[in-house]
């Protein structure tokens, strides 16, 4: 049995790639920005705010929830979403470390 593509890379590289993938859609960025701005649990107003279909919004929320960056709790017939502060801080630290590791002077490109 051969190696999978993810086996070719370090755990840190795979984790960073998965984190980037989780937020790598403009709708997900918009959702995160909205949740940060509201700084509270948000329910149905996301669909109206984004202008996307309910199913599309739900799919993006599912991806963010699977990544752990948001939490969802059931409140009656709806789900209330908010940023998971612990995971948010982890994302921030990982990306900060990644971009901080490489010191690029004015121009190193050809």
Predicted features along the sequence, with ranges:
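Amphipathic alpha-helical dimerization/coiled-coil segments
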Residues: 1-15, 37, 85-110
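N-terminal helix-turn-helix DNA-binding core of bacterial DNA-binding proteins
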Residues: 14-53, 75-87
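Alpha-helical residues within the helix-turn-helix
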Residues: 48, 65-66
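Short, hydrophobic-biased segments on the C-terminal half of alpha helices
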Residues: 61-62
